[in-house]
Amino acid sequence: WSESTTDDLSVNDVCPLAISDFALSALANTYCVFYNKRLAENYGITDLYDIVNEGKWTIDKVLSLTKDIYTDLDADNTANGADLYGFISTARSSLNTYLWSFGGHVLEKDANGDVSLVYHSPKTNDFIEKLCSFYFDNQGIYINSKEPEYSSFFALEKFTNNEAVFINGAIGNSVEYLRSMEDDYGIIPYPKWDEAQ
């Protein structure tokens, strides 16, 4: 059993569920960031694995790499879902993952095992403000909440069509949806909040 998950989910010495290596869906639903290696190289983005390994893969680093990557593919002079972006995201569960990748928590246990809600904190507010700015104030970043109709496959479709340098998703997407992709892609973790994390 996953020790950290069992510890995190136990309340009053009772764990209502557990996860092990046998839970393939838990592994498949591990969130990550995919990147198109050819597009990344075309935009001068190299050494991503080194950036990650050196602890420099932060939300600000993602922003600096992607904020100016935009091509108006449909030539309508409007930024919309038909264009190429540096980073594309779906608007639902893939956004929740930032809380954990930034080092945040919903609940915390004290030394006695008592649980308290810590989600509503200045740190969480900082996370939300940063993500709102990240997704809505940068030409090179697109989130499908701007689309007239929601599709959970939007980012994957853009990525497989080579219209996004980066997308966030889950490891299982590589097996289910990215096999048909002609370009090579890489898998890296969600960004950290800052290098000190």
What are these regions (language model features)?
Residues 91, 169-174:
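Beta->alpha turn/N-cap motifs
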Residues 31-35, 39-40, 98-99:
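Short glycine- and hydrophobic/aromatic-rich loop-to-beta-strand nucleating segment
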Residues 73-83:
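Acidic, glycine-anchored loop motifs typical of Ca2+
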Residues 61-68, 151-167:
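Short helices/loops that flank or line small-molecule/ion binding pockets
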